[in-house]
Amino acid sequence: MAHGLPTAQDMAPASSLGSALDSETIQDPSQEPAQPPGQEPAAPPAIALTIGGSDSGGGAGIQADLKTFMALKVHGCSALSCVTAQNTRGVSRVDALPPEALTAQIEAVLSDLPVAALKTGMLLNRGLIEAAARALAPLAIPKLIDPVMVSRAGAMLLEPEAIQAYRDLLLPLAELIT
């Protein structure tokens, strides 16, 4: 233990986890692996942005989008619009983030990463839809718009007064609507 804190080796069992945490097998992410002679370096993965709600059960929302991106070997970024308390039996709570928080997340990703495509999901209210539309309108990348309205268990995930904003502001930006 260094400085009274346990190290990974102190805490790891003498199993495959312990050997996986061996300092000799952990590669410094700042060090690029050596390319075999004559082999081209692998292209970096495409980057996609998902904008939507968080599902605490992990079965929908941005969690599902990020799992899909990973399966497709796409680097996934996210911007949260809402946080839900839900599981396989239903949704017990939905909290919308302020539109300014959504805008800040989208701008943070777009200012640093070359996003090649994006997907929207749950945008609970008119303010979130307007914020997303303002951020997405100038982007010349494919946009998949998924107007999430109701959960699988029947909970409303789009306020009725926001439906027209979806039609007017987001759907015209879409290359694909689900």
Positions of predicted regions on the chain:
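Conserved beta-alpha-beta core of the PfkB/ribokinase-like small-molecule kinase fold
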Residues: 120, 124-178
